[in-house]
Amino acid sequence: LVLEPLDNLTVTADVYRIDIRDRISLSSNLVLNNTAINYLRNNGVGDINYTSARYFTNATDTSTDGIDLVANYRYQFDNGVRWNSTVGYNYNHTKVTDVKANPAILDQLGVNLVRVDRRERIGLLGDTTPQHKLSLGNDFTFGPWALHSNLVRYGEFTSYQADKVNDQTFSAAWLLDLAVDYTHKNWVFTLGGDNVTDKYPEKLNDFASSGGNLAYSTYSPYGYSGAFYYGKVAYNW
């Protein structure tokens, strides 16, 4: 859907639903007994010195609902400054709609466990990342100069575990990127910074950090390197 309610203002909306059958994903951790280990060895798996395993499976069906809203406004001031502003909003929610029964071989091997447990069902296959994202971008140009800003808000998200007591919810976060350009003939000189407020994700709790091996969630929508500043030179033919 595209609307132009005012001069220089454009609004677009995209609503979608995506259904996936037999989605490929990793199974939960399956505890292996001696029968299962011998079966793996007899089918080409090398020396096995572990007690659990995961494998890729088509055990689930998923459904994703979402909406993308974008509004863009353009304006030129009397002094020659041109302004371009874009506001965007995204909502995205995924859920598991069906989990297939275990294959017979697992029962035969005595590995009759939940192939897709709570962690995979709600988290890895569901809402591991924020459901809500809001962005505001502004570009100002005047003569050879241009100023760019992009402000993004990521909504909260939850890292799910097999046991609900170990779940961890991460708060919403704002990030700001800034850049300035100067154009001279075919040359463009840029100075900028990403995440200029030096925002870091919240640290994982003791359970999710795997004994301290991981400080931050690998599903954070933004990185854990803090602020990043740069300069670049471009030449346009």
Protein language model annotation of sequence segments:
Residues 57-62, 166-170, 220:
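Outer-membrane beta-barrel proteins
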Residues 7, 65, 77-81, 143-144, ...:
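Short coil turns and loop connectors of transmembrane beta-barrels in diderm outer membranes
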Residues 131-135, 173-177, 228:
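Transmembrane beta-barrel architecture of outer membranes
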Residues 2-21, 192:
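Structural signature of Gram-negative outer-membrane beta-barrels, strongest in the C-terminal barrel
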Residues 166-168, 179-182:
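Hydrophobic alpha-helical bundle architecture
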Residues 93, 150-160, 181-237:
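C-terminal beta-signal and adjacent terminal beta-strands/loops
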Residues 14-161, 232-236:
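Gram-negative outer-membrane beta-barrel transporters
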Residues 2, 70, 179-181:
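Residues within well-ordered beta-strands of beta-sheet-rich folds
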